[in-house]
Amino acid sequence: MSEQHGAQGNPFPGEPNTGHVWDNNLRELTNPPPKWWMWGLHASWIFTLAYFLAYPSIPLLSSHTKGFLHWTSMSEYRADLKEIEQVRLPYEKRIAALSATDILKDKELSDYSQRTGKVLFGDNCAACHGANGAGNVGFPVLADDDWLYGGTIDKIQESITGGRSGVMLAFAQQLSPQDIDRLAQYVLEWSAGTQAADTEGKRLFTSAGCVGCHGADGKGNQLMGSANLTDKVWRFSHEKEDIKRIIAHGVNFVTDPETRRTQMPAWGQRLSATDIKKLAIFVHELGGGK
């Protein structure tokens, strides 16, 4: 229990304490904090009050106090964006004045286009074509050298600008299920390099008219966007049942309700000509550009 002693009865005379003593020894001292600590304390609440008044701080029903500086994160963002746009402006002007082919010849502009094109690709293209052009099922890989419509910088720019919507005929009404099965097997073997002995498959491939688009050698035709059947690159699936479905119902064949629907949208009205050039250069430099 505490005992309170008067000034005359303080058992520790000369010591700055409150006079409260516990267990004849424990007492409450009255040492003041150092001046530097008190200055820090007062400086902290003064700074807090100034910050409170200068910046947005108090939420209201439909708004908030603005602060006498009228600062907002959006105004800071716009100022930073304006600053970086001034840095980019000389590059953007040069890109606008040159063709994509000429930009590729200029290392500085090419590097700039690839860096900014990567951002554009992530915002607009990666959802279908995957990060860094790795592809997804139904969407072409852009990092290899297998191109449906050509891998030159001009062809890539053309594909981005106008989009692509290739068509493959449906053969369900022309071929029997057995013929479709045999043809699918032939295409599988062709991709694996083991089709040479399949004379019946070759006959079907020719008589059904497949050679008209894919060529007698099966290597496709970039003017038509027809696939190369002799490599191991599959836009959709290499499973036999999926190949049979494509042969039977085609791709984007409007009169067949079971056709595989696939289309690349045109970006000519969504992106500026400069952005399309940068995107084309980024895709071209992923590794498969011609």
Would you name each region that the model predicts?
Residues 18, 25, 29, 138, ...:
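Glycine-rich, flexible loop/turn motifs
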Residues 137, 143-193, 217, 221-224, ...:
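Extracytoplasmic electron-transfer domains, predominantly the class I c-type cytochrome c fold
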Residues 2-108, 149-155, 170-187, 268-283:
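Periplasmic c-type cytochrome electron-transfer domains
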Residues 99-112, 130, 141, 146:
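Sequence context of c-type cytochrome heme-c attachment sites
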Residues 109-134, 148-150, 157-162, 194-223, ...:
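Sequence/structural segment immediately N-terminal to covalent heme-attachment motifs in c-type
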Residues 39, 53, 122, 135-138, ...:
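Basic, gly/Ser/Thr/Pro-rich low-complexity segments located predominantly at protein N termini
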